């Protein structure tokens, strides 16, 4: 079992992190002489310069090539500082990756390419392996031996300790090189400065060919090279198999590092392990395997032990970790067999799904065509053909028998039709179309009866419309009778006709003679029916085949005289048949006659109708002579022939072709389904079926894959899914496991030697692995291993590290510029990358185009290509500096413009991930760069290289109103900037005053010498509040630690997932983070953000339960949730958004009751849930985490926004509450398209009275606590009035003073139908008094009545007239009770509440059930720790313990009154202390003290009318009693320029304390304002506002917002202005003059005085001119250094003193 190696790693000293930071302490072994070595700080430079004597400085100038020590420390790879026992700096050393003095390109491609010539110029011993990977160059070394009187022996000890520190910091190093400059050859002082070190620690490398040195720029001809191997300063460690006598040495190390193993397995565990050599774990489970014990020996002492074996549960590891990239630790052949089998399974599944889908499509297509009108008509035709004889005989019988025909009625005909259609059924689509509505979305479903279908079908063939209702019957009846009469007259002898007057009776008789019969006429039906049957499938098929065979002829018929196809409709369908016969196509007469009809019926041909007038057709001249004579006799009666109308049906070729093809499609399908019969068609279908069979055979043949046999095929043949792992045969296992490892701290840098020896023992294995608990820090050994990500569903409580044998070849890593020949090997590197084509193109461009701005580098290991990197030749540095805080990480003046590059693409074999920093360092060296940047665009998947870089905080340009500066650069500026067209991203404007559209990371050469250590502690942060986000931001900002397991529980996601524009907001937001800042943090990409809510806590099991029916383990739980609206929780209702979670649905299923059960008083079956009991759809809390998702504008039907904005019967929404959130929500609804008159805003009354004056701080804090629970929307009545007036003017219905009384619910659907609100009547107190009087009267009446025990005899009242009954006292009381309250009932589909604010009751019960202390708030220590050491809590739900009451005089112990971002920073410091990482931050405070919290707090919202609102106030709750009692001595400054009608303008208000410090600031306006600028005002003196108070009072400033946006004020908003003020203040405090003034001010304050203007002028006059000059010069320097953000200020050039 693999679990055998799950031992606690004994080597878990916290100092491992310090070693990674090069801040570990290495002391000399000599008791009388000890030194400390640490990584250098830039502050050390001045101290080092102080201890360098003048003669030593001259010697150093010859020995070392450096412009200044600061530049050396900043730009070189590694620098260390040497200290004595008194912590005094006694020296320093600097190391780089190329020799000092080297410049230029040696090979005309690479800079600093020393390995190109060093081996030709000097004769290195062949046994020494020197590569850039395992070697550094010493470029500076100094020890103040003269000042501190160090002996030569002590100097050597110091040098050894420095080198030991370097080797411990960089374990891969095997030696250090030093180039002794030729300029020192004749200088004895320089020689003496370093001679002892070179003689005793270094070895001089003989010169092979000094002429080669001549060609090397920067290297003196007489230069010498010295080499110091690792064993010169560090004892050689020998790795061997363990022996029993090693026990005593190893036990000492074990006991020193960990007592866990000794306590678990006994004192002689090591001896037993070594003796058996195959028992890897003792205890209850004992089994044998091939375990081995390896020992590291220095001289005759064992200093380390590694226990290894090959006993691994591979299947378990594959289930828990993402090991696919590493073949799941199998042999490649075995993994290939698994992958082949998985590919087969994947293909089989894919083919099965494709075949099933095709079968479904085929079946649905059959049903579609059968259900289609054409298919139904063809089926109908076949049915009629089968009954043709019966139908024709019946029709002939009726027509030929006058007696039957004259009695024929519509009903009888309908019965005939129904009888003829018996057995025919219309086909309807099956349920498949419901399952797959997307396949054939336009499928027809006919709802006609068979009789209706027949009649409508025959209408295509001439049956008149509305035929069954009599239309078209007895057509041409009059003409027929007249013709019959004429023929009859011709047969009789002619008589002389004499005119006589007509009589009425004769006329009536004539009309009756020509009147059509009233009985049913079957003749039109007979004609249409015969035509319908005439175009049978056989005829249609023959016709179609002839058309297909003569397609060229057909096309010509649709062309114009020039042979061009005419797209318009111009060919008459009625004549098309005759035209086709003219082309000798021999179309059958019945088809020719009915061509238009059957193409309409069976092809749905499209055409347009046109009526033209034509001459009637000529009679046939070969008529019978008698008839001709008859015509001649009646010639006198003939009228001249006139044109008659003719209907044209004009179509185009494409429409004709489409109709023929559609008819073919249906004919074939109906024949295949054996619905229609046709010999010709059957033959065609048979050929189609045969071709389909051949295609299917070819498809199956194509699917078959031929592979070469694999020896492991039999092991994987039974795999059925893609996740399973078969039993792994021994010869397929490819890993070794480290069960136990410990080593003396002094030899940790040699840990990898054990791994190399382990591979030599198990030579057939390629991987070595190790697991350890999450909380154990990474050792030096594990810093060389790759950490494997866990699978999402993994519950394994260890992390897994692996190391591949090939990584032992890291010494052979070689980086050079890419060549074209490398491109043939890049495919495996790019194959799994998302943007592989872009990387390929950019790499090719960098190789082939010399003018490209990109450079490509290839990484090789043992001649194999393992990586491709694409970087830029330069960067737009000005843009980076102006948009990001690059200065936080580098000294800009030490890194010229040419020293910067940008990483564009990376592709690296994952086995070599741990070598990323070395590769980046080599790229910088070969390009002569010192800084590398990496841009992360929005929604970019972060690459692995991101973890090696340092995140750079974004900057914001100083503004008040967010508008462009009133400033333009002069020509000189552009001349100084130069031409940026050839620079990478040169088009970016450094002064665009916009947020950068990307995030930035950076790494410098100096940073690369530090190892970024993984911290695997599982930190679960509950709540995405400002505190939680600030806490995570602080952890992520630690440069040298990579926190790999931070999980943020953010139900509904973080804010940036929902808000892109201010109008998207649905709630008020704090001013701690802007949306731009949150986006730049990229929290969703850098930590694991879970859309889940904590519902249970198991503190013993150290896990929490989520509402997604999942559990989440933790090592540290950090609760940062805020206070929420409790209105719904007080009513035991679940907010609608939360109800989508399965947890809450199951909760109601278990605890819920319907109304009937509630009214009956029936208890819940499973008891009562402590928080929730019911659910109403459409009722939301404003703090519902899914509020944004629920009210998202999706465009989907019946979504919330759709219901509120639809044109027909839109729904209404009611917002209840008095917080700023409610008004922001109203604005969000209006911005989402909800009409204002659909919005009801109901405001409850306040629960406490507003208070301004306080007797003491305690009274003020009590009042502030109430305000937290029931906050006002605005602190300024003027702002409140403006907003409410605007809302009411737009039609929003506002109801003030009402409380939520009842929610009307549809009991079946649980949908909100309406809301009832209630408030006390105006005469409420009077009514109460009247009720009491009436009750007293009832008591008196009952006491005086003889029948008091019976009460009022209501039977008498019911017997009499109700209208005349007297009103009883009880009825009067009922009437008074009804009048106590005024109710309003609002019909509303949605209700959003924002009532009293308090702790989430679910969180409260979690706290209560786990025994955490709660007293109105969760009680925490000053380090935010609860009673559980691994549970921290911070934010609005917390309160410091009462033990700190004496420390919080005048300050609130509750944290809801402090800035959340500041709290998060303090919380991060405390957690780092718990992890023993507190040294990584500058914050310092003890557990016995409360943290200092001073940052202002603020809130903002986007309000109706597109108004931006912000209110920020000082965090100042501790004021002296005299201050509390004193009246304000300064008026508020209020500037109101808002036009109420047009809603344009600004409103700003400054409130000052009695010392002239800005206490509060309020802004309201249509123009966005910089939040940081508003925040910067708070705590600022009124004197910084350019005499604003005086100018405004005198009317000189009409608009303060405009005034504060002028150029003079921009410096106030600079992000570093507050830091500048602080530094200036600290410098001033050093002055005695300032101290005297402060003492005077303190006495004045003790007497009750304030900094009134008179007193300020008085003390201002006492400030010395030197201090004023110092302040002025400091201000100029500040502006001069920040010209990229303050270009509008003119600063005179700085004077340079020249000695």
Swiss-Prot record:
Biased composition (Polar residues): 1-22
A Gene Ontology term for the protein's cellular component: 9+2 motile cilium
Protein name per the record: Cilia- and flagella-associated protein 61
Pfam families in UniProt: CFAP61_dimer, CFAP61_N
Taxonomic superkingdom: Eukaryota
Cytoplasm is among the record's keywords: no
Annotated stretches, region: Disordered: 1-23, 489-515, 1340-1365
Bias kind Basic and acidic residues: ranges: 504-515, 1340-1359
Biased composition (Basic residues): 489-503
Gene Ontology process terms (BP): cilium movement; cilium organization
Location(s), subcellular: Cell projection, Cilium
Keywords for this protein: Cell projection, Coiled coil
Function: As component of a spoke-associated complex, regulates ciliary mobility by mediating a stable and functional assembly of the radial spoke 3 (RS3).
Matches recorded under InterPro entries: CFAP61 (IPR038884), CFAP61_dimer (IPR056299), CFAP61_N (IPR032151), FAD/NAD-bd_sf (IPR036188)
Disruption phenotype: Knockout cells show deficiencies in cell multiplication and ciliary functions. Mutants move with greatly reduced velocities, have disturbed waveform of beating cilia and have stiffer cilia. Mutant cilia lack an adjacent portion of the radial spoke 3 stem region.
